[in-house]
């Protein structure tokens, strides 16, 4: 059983989460952070990257609609965040789709220390250099062991690795968990994974480094449960209602609800 504490800390501390994210996800991510009690700051201007991370409690880097001028800003923000000691989350959206994305993520992983890397199976398989047929920015398909992919990424980059999907896989290289909550409606709305990465940033913001695995586990479980509850009673075509309902459920989440619905297995 989880011992949910980080959600309440977010609501009491209202951490500022710096997001360098994509144009598709920015609004949804900002509203989702507000729903859980965090405060979003969306900035990708190179001129601000020495300052904004110093004002923030976490940084989330998302390469979803990557533009060349943003890469240097991402690196500088990441280095500044490392310097001041706040956690950095990487969402390597579509990293396997193009050479530019692969090169960008390789540079980020070389120059920035990440507390967590969160993506779908295809994205983390690319980072782990495991064969997988990714489909653009979507997960695609493959036969690899997802738990092993998460383990490889976690060990290689000394971080928390999280793979989102029908089952979520979490690893810090030593501890491993699978989250069995969620809904098939998640991939039916754009930026649901991007919002999860932002939520992970908020949970890490109120945790100490030695608590990052537990914070990520609570973040991903809480988010999956919010989606599960938002989908109750909806038809598979009611994407708009799910979109709004997810924000509502994130705002209504409580530690009691998380414990009531959590379905987690450990390895």
Curated annotation (Swiss-Prot):
Residues that, per the record, bind substrate: 42, 191
GO molecular function, one term: magnesium ion binding
Main EC class the enzyme belongs to: transferase
EC number, UniProt record: 2.7.1.50
The reaction(s) this protein catalyses: 5-(2-hydroxyethyl)-4-methylthiazole + ATP = 4-methyl-5-(2-phosphooxyethyl)-thiazole + ADP + H(+)
SUPFAM superfamilies assigned: Ribokinase-like
Binding site for ATP: 118, 164
Taxonomic superkingdom: Bacteria
Pathway: Cofactor biosynthesis; thiamine diphosphate biosynthesis; 4-methyl-5-(2-phosphoethyl)-thiazole from 5-(2-hydroxyethyl)-4-methylthiazole: step 1/1
GO biological process terms on file: thiamine biosynthetic process; thiamine diphosphate biosynthetic process
Keywords, sorted A to Z: ATP-binding, Kinase, Magnesium, Metal-binding, Nucleotide-binding, Thiamine biosynthesis, Transferase
InterPro entries in alphabetical order: Hyethyz_kinase (IPR000417), Ribokinase-like (IPR029056)
CDD domains the record matches: THZ_kinase
Cofactor: Mg(2+)
Protein family: Belongs to the Thz kinase family.
Role description: Catalyzes the phosphorylation of the hydroxyl group of 4-methyl-5-beta-hydroxyethylthiazole (THZ).
Protein name: Hydroxyethylthiazole kinase
Organism: Pasteurella multocida (strain Pm70)
């Amino acid at each position: 059983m989880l011992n949910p504490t980080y959600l309440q800390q977010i609501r009491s501390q209202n951490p500022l989460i710096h997001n360098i994210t994509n144009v598709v996800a920015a609004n949804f991510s900002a509203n989702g952070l507000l729903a859980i009690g965090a405060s979003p700051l969306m900035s990708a201007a190179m001129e601000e990257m020495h300052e904004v991370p110093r004002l923030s409690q976490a940084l989330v880097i998302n390469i979803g609609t990557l533009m060349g001028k943003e890469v240097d800003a991402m690196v500088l923000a990441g280095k500044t965040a490392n310097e001041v000691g706040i956690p950095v989350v990487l969402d390597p959206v579509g990293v396997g789709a193009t050479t530019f994305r692969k090169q960008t993520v390789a540079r980020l992983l070389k120059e920035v220390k990440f507390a967590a890397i969160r993506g779908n199976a295809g994205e983390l398989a690319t980072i782990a250099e495991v064969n997988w047929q990714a489909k653009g920015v979507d997960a695609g398909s493959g036969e690899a062991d997802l738990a092993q992919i998460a383990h490889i990424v976690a060990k290689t980059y000394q971080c928390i690795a999280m793979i989102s999907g029908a089952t979520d896989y979490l690893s810090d290289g030593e501890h491993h968990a699978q989250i069995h909550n969620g809904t098939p409606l998640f991939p039916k709305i754009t930026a649901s994974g991007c919002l999860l990465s932002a939520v992970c940033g908020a949970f890490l913001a109120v945790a100490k480094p030695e608590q990052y695995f537990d914070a990520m586990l609570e973040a991903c479980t809480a988010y999956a449960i919010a989606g599960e509850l938002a989908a109750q009673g909806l038809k598979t075509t009611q994407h708009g209602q799910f979109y709004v309902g997810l924000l509502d459920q994130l705002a209504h989440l409580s530690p009691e609800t998380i414990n009531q619905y959590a379905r987690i297995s450990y390895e």
